[in-house]
């Protein structure tokens, strides 16, 4: 292998296209990640960190370039194919021809196993199927059919894969740990395992019966390239004697600082000579070694600082080196070499139009001849038609209407044709439904004209503009078509500092807190607002925080924490993330399909229906009676067809809260408060209409009533028109439902005609109503003025509820109850059919002792008029859940948590998730009763988090990134230190939070959390459940402690707790307005002259550093030199680039 020489061509930068101006502020690394030769054409392919694939000819001239992977995911592997090029990213597989036209594109949305992919290879000669594998053990090894573009097979593989290579019979799998498995793709199993390298495999090649590998081993704690390459013979399944490849630092020149012999980093079997292997190191030295006679070799040195990739052409005559900074350079055997492959295909290029004269004369009026065929002369001066914008003074006008007889005739003809179409359809089996004005709004209405100047002003207006904010909070519609801005579906916008850049204050000027939309199932926010201002519900839920209930995940406890946080926040934004996390851990909620962002109408579940499918149908099934298929379908269609996800969740939530209260009071004689508040005692009576005469009665209790349209078989409402009826007949009819069905009798076990009657026997203080009406029924209801009654009177007469608008209409001597509308949830449907929920709540103003109505649209909170709140006539507004309260209950005061005798014992003892273990490592000292914290007690805090999901990004055509949804993070570790006293700086809480979810990234460099630290089976840390730590944190907040830390605002947001500013001492005090924020590490260097965070982060160290910084701040503030000292810190920081030097 002599006569190799460096190519005469200068190295070429393959990342030139990534150095465009619009990418210069992108912090993403710009580099080439993979280089391969084309096996069918004289091309070399390069994939980069932005997901783009480029091809170059032997002169480095660009042939094609295309974006292969959405989201600018880096290319991790490339394979040349007879029909094009195959590229792989971590979550997608892309196949295109050589001209860059996509032939197949598969993402994780198409094949779920496409996750954290690292490598791929063919395993057949026809190249029709490809194997892919990577670092996600859950994905295993997948086989993709390139012809069909589908997943062919999937094989479970327990190890992380780094390299794969095939000899078209077997596949060699290089595992991340350094060993090798031989995989048979026919039987989909590993047939043999080979020992490899002690640390990892860096390169591997497999041809015929020869397998060669290069790897790394640990030497004195550092990874060093092995000085031997491993050779295997797969015929005998054994390793042959390794071949030495060792270069001294002096051999490769002075550009390396290594003190150890240099080993092999890259290798490839020669494509023409089967016993020759090309081996190279990252320093640039490379050899051609004969495996039969290893002493026969030819050493070379590539002149560069370092190389990142090394590959041989299919002809064996070219060597490509990818140098530092993505520069490509080549070696060849002689200057006469013509191409990368021996039988190169002819490349296709685009056609160029010929500038020729028109062969015949074209008339000006000839409409069939395209004007684009007439070329324009070349020019070098500014054309006369290029007038400046200052010439045009008009703002733009509307085109004048063309008047004439022709237009009217056309209108008449079109009207006649439409009438003929309508008559034709009406005579057929299909018919057109009349246009629903109340659902879709008026049509054929011309929008008012807005000049370009007005539009321009609207586009450039900012959220700081008071007028714009006023428009944003406008809740009254200007016409019957447009939806007011206050009802728009809100989206959070994330800036450089995440959600901290978002101005929530512009959406809420009240004292009542809204909720962020940065959670799953955003519709849950409105259900929380629905019950937040019901005094009896609030008082009971918050009172449950008085005692410890941390054994299991409790919806009742989490709702109490959330209600208390929203009260304490006093209008500041809050999150319901912890509440949603607890709901997601409940299997029943998942089975009901509650975790979705789609809130449209659902038709129920297959199989046995549950309570949410209607009062009567669920009760029949509770009696274990068999109903035939026809009857079951009729019941589902009648009672569960228009049930929405929010209504299902409302029923689930109330039932869950009641069941948790019952469980807590199993050994107590106390009354079940929520049952008394919401419980409807329902009697279901079933009478068989035959000689059998079977009669069954079963009482039961429901927490929420499904309100349907009055039944046609109800004598009381059969002759009344609903066009002048309020909601009261709907409620009263739903409290007494009657149905006749054919079902199997439980006594004679025969199909008999049966009567089913479901009757409510009581009137609880709170009525939770799920309004389930059809679109046609809503059309009728919206025409009734005052359909949603503000109040009504009710009584029980003859064991049946009677509801009237006036008390004088109830001619009875029984007790009469007045109910007032407390709150309700409405569904808003925009012009594009997208739906979201808003909540209306009636709240008592303590200053003037009058009730006011407020509208909650997630984090937008606005006071509105009562008439507007009760108006449901708009086509875009539909009530779903309504809460009526007894007039006496609504006037009860809200009880503050501060008046409760809260149990604080958990602050003085351990509560591990798996009990007290002997091998647990404690780095803290528990508080004693003598150290009981009180108002003003300083507590230093730092929290660490792990990432559960990746962020969702949107990238436009210019490469600008927009964060749509940040990565979901979970609390991993929290350390709290004493901030004063004899034990100042000593931790009293150092909790690791157990995590049972999939962790996408441990963020070890920033969190100090290692894999296994949060696993109760493996960890030796003090593991606790999140509920345990949260109660400790909540208790310290209630006791009035003052928290000291760095970046506490973000920590408290992720912990999901609101701490008033008066109880926060953040090291952000070291900040000059208009300047950059200083990191904790740099502040420790600049102020304390100490180094922190030298390795992984440690929350105890970070909390203690923040405490010392705060003490220093108080000292400087007392001397009156803090501002001058801070300016010196910034001046010094500019010299170091705000980075900590290696030595202090």
Swiss-Prot record:
| Source organism of this protein record | Kluyveromyces lactis (strain ATCC 8585 / CBS 2359 / DSM 70799 / NBRC 1267 / NRRL Y-1140 / WM37) (Yeast)
- Record's cofactor remark: Binds 2 metal cations per subunit in the catalytic exonuclease domain.
What EC number(s) are associated with this protein in UniProt?
3.1.13.4
Where, subcellularly, is it found? Cytoplasm
Q: Which GO terms describe its biological process?
A: mRNA processing; nuclear-transcribed mRNA poly(A) tail shortening
Question: Any idea where the USP domain is?
Answer: 482-887
Protein name, entry field? PAN2-PAN3 deadenylation complex catalytic subunit PAN2
* Binding positions (a divalent metal cation): 942, 944, 1051, 1102
- Described purpose of this protein according to its UniProt entry: Catalytic subunit of the poly(A)-nuclease (PAN) deadenylation complex, one of two cytoplasmic mRNA deadenylases involved in mRNA turnover. PAN specifically shortens poly(A) tails of RNA and the activity is stimulated by poly(A)-binding protein PAB1. PAN deadenylation is followed by rapid degradation of the shortened mRNA tails by the CCR4-NOT complex. Deadenylated mRNAs are then degraded by two alternative mechanisms, namely exosome-mediated 3'-5' exonucleolytic degradation, or deadenylation-dependent mRNA decaping and subsequent 5'-3' exonucleolytic degradation by XRN1.
- Looking at the record, which segments are called Linker? 344-481
User: What is known about its subunit structure?
Assistant: Forms a heterotrimer with an asymmetric homodimer of the regulatory subunit PAN3 to form the poly(A)-nuclease (PAN) deadenylation complex.
Q: Which GO cellular component terms are attached?
A: P-body; PAN complex
Keyword Cytoplasm present in the record's keywords: the answer is yes
